[in-house]
C-alpha cells in the first residue's frame, strides 16, 4: 500500500479493506511503499505544466514514479519478516513481478481504476499518445504477472477484460464497503429541498460548475431550495448556496458535521464527468439520500442500477435542472429512492462481502 498513514487518516477504502482483512485474521502485515515527501514533491515538479489538469495527468502517468515505488516495494517485501502465502497490492503502480514470480507466490491486485478508465476521463489530446501508451504497457506488464485482479465495480471489471484483453477468469468483482452503517430513515424529511454536493478537488471535473448553473434554474421555481457544497472553500457567494470547507472524516467533530449534512439532505448531486468509483455516492445511499450522477464511468452502476436515483448527460445543466426539479417536486419518490439506496448498502456494499469474495478467490491459489 502507498502511504499507509495518509490512507488511515482519510479512512480510505483501501485502508478499510486491510482493516477488515486483519479483523478476519487474513492479514499477515502491510508494506508501506510511500516515498519521502521531498521526493514526491520533486517528482510532481518534474511533471509541471501551466494547465493544472495536464500537470495532474502527467503526474498520474509518470513511469519514473512507478518504477521508483516498485523498487521500494520489492525491498520492503524482501525485508518483511512475517509469514505469508499470498500478496495483495493496491492499484497498478507497482510492478512486483521480480519478487513474487521467482518465489511462486500468488499475487493479486485491488482496483478502483485503471489507465484506460482514467484516460477516458481526460480531455482529448491532453497528453501525447506515447505517454499514455507507456502507462498502458506498464500496467499490462503488471497484470500479466498477477494471478488475479479484484475490482470495486463491475464496470471496471469489464474494462480489464475489454481494454486489456485479460481473461474473464482472471478478473473478479470484489465490490466496496460503505464506511457508514445504514440508519433508520424514520422521521427523515425529504421536503427540505436541500441539495448536497461533495468534492475536495477538481471542482469543474466533478460537475460543480454545471450544478451551479442548474441550481440557478432550480432556484427560480423553488425559492427556498438550498445548495450545500462541501469539500473546499470554493469562494462562491450566491443566493441559496452554502459552502463548507474540507471536513476530515478522521476527526470526530468533522465526521459528526459531515454525517449531519447527509442527514439533512434531500438529494445528493455530483454530475462528475467521470468517477473511478464514486465512494461518496455510497455514503449518500448509506444515509438514505437519493442521488443524481452523470451517465459516465461507474455512476450508472451505483446509482441507476440500484434504483437509488438517476444519471444525466455530463455537462448538460438543462437536463440536470429538469431532473432536480422533478425530484424535489416529489418527496415520496425521493424517500423510495433513498430506501432503495439503503437496501443496496445493506445487501451489497459492505466489507464482509468484499473480503469474502477476495478470500474465496485467493484460497484457490494457496
Q: For each predicted feature, which ranges?
A:
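A short, well-ordered alpha-helix in the C-terminal region of glycosyltransferases
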Residues: 319, 326, 333-348, 354-360
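Short hydrophobic beta-strand element within catalytic cores of glycosyltransferases
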Residues: 290-293, 303
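Nucleotide-activated donor-binding/catalytic signature segment of Leloir-type glycosyltransferases, i.e.
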Residues: 231-267
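Membrane-proximal helix-turn-helix segments that form the acceptor-binding/catalytic region
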Residues: 128-149
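Conserved donor-binding/catalytic core segment of Leloir-type glycosyltransferases
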Residues: 182-217, 227
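Carbohydrate-associated surface elements
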Residues: 155, 177
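Conserved acidic donor-binding segment of nucleotide-sugar-dependent glycosyltransferases
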Residues: 305-306, 310-317, 326-332
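Aromatic "clamp/platform" in nucleotide-sugar-dependent glycosyltransferases that forms part
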Residues: 273
Amino acid at each position: 500500500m502507498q502511504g499507509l498513514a495518509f490512507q488511515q487518516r482519510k479512512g480510505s477504502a483501501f485502508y478499510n479493506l486491510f482493516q477488515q482483512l486483519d479483523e478476519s485474521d487474513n492479514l499477515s502485515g502491510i508494506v508501506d511503499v510511500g516515498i519521502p515527501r521531498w521526493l514526491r514533491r520533486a517528482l510532481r515538479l518534474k511533471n509541471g505544466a501551466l494547465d493544472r489538469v495536464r500537470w495532474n495527468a502527467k503526474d498520474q502517468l509518470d513511469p519514473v514514479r512507478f518504477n521508483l515505488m516498485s523498487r521500494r516495494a520489492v525491498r520492503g517485501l524482501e525485508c518483511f519478516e512475517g509469514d505469508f502465502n499470498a500478496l495483495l497490492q493496491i492499484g497498478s503502480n507497482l510492478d512486483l513481478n521480480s519478487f513474487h514470480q521467482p518465489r511462486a507466490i500468488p499475487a493479486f491486485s485491488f482496483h478502483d481504476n485503471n489507465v484506460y478508465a482514467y484516460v477516458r476521463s481526460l480531455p482529448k489530446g491532453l497528453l501525447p499518445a506515447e505517454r499514455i501508451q507507456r502507462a498502458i504497457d506498464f500496467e499490462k506488464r503488471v497484470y500479466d504477472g498477477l494471478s488475479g485482479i479484484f475490482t470495486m465495480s463491475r464496470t471496471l471489471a469489464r474494462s480489464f477484460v475489454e481494454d486489456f484483453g485479460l481473461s474473464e477468469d482472471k478478473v473478479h468483482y470484489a465490490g466496496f464497503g460503505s464506511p457508514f452503517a445504514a440508519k433508520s430513515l424514520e422521521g427523515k424529511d425529504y421536503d427540505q429541498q436541500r441539495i448536497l454536493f461533495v468534492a475536495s478537488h477538481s471542482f469543474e471535473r466533478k460537475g460543480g460548475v454545471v450544478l451551479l448553473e442548474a441550481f440557478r434554474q432550480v432556484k427560480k421555481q423553488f425559492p427556498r431550495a438550498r445548495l450545500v457544497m462541501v469539500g473546499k472553500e470554493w469562494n462562491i457567494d450566491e443566493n441559496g448556496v452554502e459552502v463548507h470547507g474540507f471536513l476530515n472524516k478522521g476527526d470526530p467533530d468533522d465526521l459528526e458535521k459531515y454525517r449531519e449534512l447527509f442527514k439533512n439532505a434531500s438529494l445528493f448531486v455530483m454530475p462528475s464527468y467521470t468517477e473511478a468509483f464514486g465512494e461518496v455516492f455510497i455514503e449518500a445511499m448509506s444515509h438514505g439520500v437519493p442521488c443524481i450522477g452523470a451517465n459516465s464511468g461507474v455512476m450508472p452502476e451505483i446509482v441507476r442500477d440500484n434504483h437509488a436515483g438517476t444519471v444525466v448527460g455530463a455537462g448538460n445543466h438543462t437536463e440536470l435542472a429538469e431532473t432536480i426539479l422533478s425530484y424535489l417536486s416529489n418527496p415520496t419518490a425521493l424517500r423510495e429512492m433513498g430506501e432503495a439506496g439503503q437496501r443496496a448498502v445493506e445487501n451489497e456494499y459492505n466489507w464482509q462481502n468484499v473480503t469474502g469474495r477476495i478470500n474465496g478467490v485467493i484460497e484457490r491459489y494457496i
